[in-house]
From Swiss-Prot:
It catalyses: D-glucose 6-phosphate(in) + phosphate(out) = D-glucose 6-phosphate(out) + phosphate(in). Glycans are attached at N52, N63, N67. It holds the Pfam family MFS_1. This is Glucose-6-phosphate exchanger SLC37A2. It comes from Danio rerio (Zebrafish). The keyword Endoplasmic reticulum applies. PANTHER family: GLUCOSE-6-PHOSPHATE EXCHANGER SLC37A2, MAJOR FACILITATOR SUPERFAMILY TRANSPORTER 16, ISOFORM B.
Amino acid sequence: MKSLAPGIKLITSFSRDSWYRFSILFLTFVFYTSYHLSRKPISIVKSQLHRNCSNVVHPANLNITDNDTWCDWVPFDGKNYQNLFGVLDNCFLVAYAVGMFFSGIFGERLPLRYYLSTGMLLSGLFTALFGLGFYWQIHSLWYYCLVQALNGLVQTTGWPAVVACVGNWFGKGKRGFIMGVWNSHTSVGNILGSLIAGVYVSSAWGLSFIVPGIIIASTGVICFLFLVERPEDVNCTAPQHHERVEEEPLLRNSSTNEEIFNSHTSTAVEPVEDHSEAISFCGALRIPGVVEFSLCLLFAKLVSYTFLYWLPLYIANVAHFDPKKAGDLSTLFDVGGILGGIVAGLVSDYTGGRASTCCAMLIIAAPMLFLYNKIGQNGLPTTVGMLLWCGALVNGPYALITTAVSADLGTHECLRGNSRALSTVTAIIDGTGSIGAAVGPLLAGLISPTGWNNVFYMLIAADVLACLLLSRLVYKEIRGWCGYTTRQRGFKEI
């Protein structure tokens, strides 16, 4: 008898449910990568909108009135250009923070496929409109602010929808690890966005926005054609979100940790009535842990986004690297964030303590930030090592809260009979965090003239506050560990 080809053996070794789960994980990864890809060009194009024109060769037929600003793009040619760039950033971030609270409410009441695909199409439109200002010769600050604000609003469709979709397909077993790996889409999108924008920024900066706009709009079409919202829609087995065991501490993971792609994940679940009515905003706030994790993320995201917007400038000013090298080194913070998110997911899966894992990483992050400010620029190896450590410790809790914790709370045991809470809970948590994302860079801009030390003291204080806000949940988890002596930890052999 002829043996099957190795590739066919591999394909047939996975069940139909497993293939669907893998496809959902891959599609949502691509979708949110495109969201971040379309956000990145503005940080790359800023250096082109305002340059040192005295070093630029001007065309012979051009009448130059100001040798220092002739090549700048009005209205960013004045001495207040940094303030105007700050206005552009905050137009996006504030609109994103406000819109996120409403996004989840709409996401629970509209089909995720339509909601997500429409959001990506509109994001592509507004991203491209910013770039079209180059070809239409638009020099009005209000135009660019309006486009940024509208883009910030429609970008809120992404995160609650993709987390809700992944939460619908994956149970609690190994959710932290899977989502920790999956959450790398943030860094992948940032890197791709930088590379694509960099190709066109010097020749025609409008294309730095138009091309990413076309990419995210194209992924919106793919979403409309291929996204499956729930396992039940294609007759797949629904995942296990709850356990039939004695009461456990808040956010405890399944001690059995079922295989994440196993098609038989719901056999131990009691059938429960599933009402189709979506949860209200106030109802989502009453879910145990939502308020604490939301406020924790506010301060955690404040630290993360301050690094995102100010780290290259800090490295250039303090370590005296040129702008390109400073930008390249700053990407190590994102690399550390990927590793931190994966480690946080693994540890929280193994211990069952989401809050304890976040708190431990935040506690260690505070002294590491202090050390980075003091010794982080003493040579290239030290800089690389400290950036990786700080990125892991700062972004690890941020990644865990926005992914696994949001999915856990959106399928919390108190919601039996009302499963439509994932999108609203995710929006509340990420929306609160986005307030910190808007405030952090703004505070850094106000504090940095007084010295970089004060900026780091602000970041350390935010880290400590984030940790303190989880103290009640950590106490409950520790009590649970001490009270349930027969409880097993670790991953069950499959």
